[in-house]
Amino acid sequence: MPKRGETAARILAAAREIVRATGPDSLTFDAVAAKVGVSKQAVLYWYPNKARLIEALVRPALEAESAAGQGAISDKASPPRAIRAFVSALAVFHSSDLDRFRLMYVTPQIGQRPGRNGQMLTTLGRIHPATTEMYDKLAATLVEGGRYDRLVEARRAAAAIHTALLGLILRMAMADALNAPLRARNDGLVEALVDVMAPEAA
């Protein structure tokens, strides 16, 4: 008999494999149960709704992303250097595993919409702190370096910087999925984005 918690780990592994192999639309409790070899009720015991299952899949990746972003920002870094390091580190993090990126930023959008029965809204509330910590560190550096006077403005900028990068990674992920490479190299696009956000001094 599996140890307590082992079934939950097998469920997550199966769900992750389903998403990677056939896409988020295929992630159903029936599909997960069949892959693990347990009943649908056994899956529901550990993850009572799809929002909880998606949260369990996504949250560790978001926390790893946050750690990568925060770790790239060195103490006393100037705002341009901090931005360049932040964007470059997250670009490497995501482009090295586009399936993980899809799991993080595409899967939660599939199926149940935020706020329906309050389930997905609660899930997003649990996930939010990991990304907030990342924004806070970049924002503090931007304020300390004089880029912004107010922390609220710096946080808004941190969110915009991150979102712009995610948009670029989404283009890369789409090109990868369609086997239709973009005209420009991926690293060249990241460099161009970084140069727009934080131009290097002449």
What name fits each language-model region?
Residues 7-16, 32, 57-61, 65, ...:
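Generic hydrophobic, amphipathic alpha-helix propensity
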Residues 10, 14, 18-52, 56:
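Helix-turn-helix
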Residues 1-6, 76, 174, 201-202:
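N-terminal intrinsically disordered/low-complexity leader segments
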Residues 93-96, 158-180, 195-202:
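Amphipathic C-terminal alpha-helical segment
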Residues 72, 76, 108-115, 172-176:
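Secondary-structure edge/capping motif, primarily at the C-terminal ends of alpha-helices
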Residues 66-71, 99, 103-105, 114-145, ...:
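Amphipathic alpha-helical packing segments from all-alpha helical-bundle domains
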Residues 56, 70-102, 154-161:
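Hydrophobic alpha-helical connector segments
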